[in-house]
Curated annotation (Swiss-Prot):
Natural source organism: Mesomycoplasma hyopneumoniae (strain 7448)
GO cellular-component term (any): ribonucleoprotein complex
Keyword Ribonucleoprotein: yes
Name under which the protein is recorded: Large ribosomal subunit protein bL34
Family membership: Belongs to the bacterial ribosomal protein bL34 family.
UniProt xrefs under Pfam families: Ribosomal_L34
Superkingdom: Bacteria
Length: 47
């Protein structure tokens, strides 16, 4: 049986990256919440 998680960098960034988050109002809410919480990394594109 094939596993459910098949890593793909491009898809990961297209869906969860900073530009993707900024492109929608809800995505910006996520970033605001993570900033408020004090997260070191806001999105997966942060290293």
């Amino acid at each position: 049986m094939k596993r459910t998680y098949q890593p793909n960098k491009r898809k990961h960034l297209k869906t969860h990256g900073f530009r993707a988050r900024m492109s929608t109002a809800d995505g910006r809410k996520i970033l605001a919440a993570r900033r408020a919480k004090g997260r070191k990394r806001l999105t997966v594109s942060d290293k």
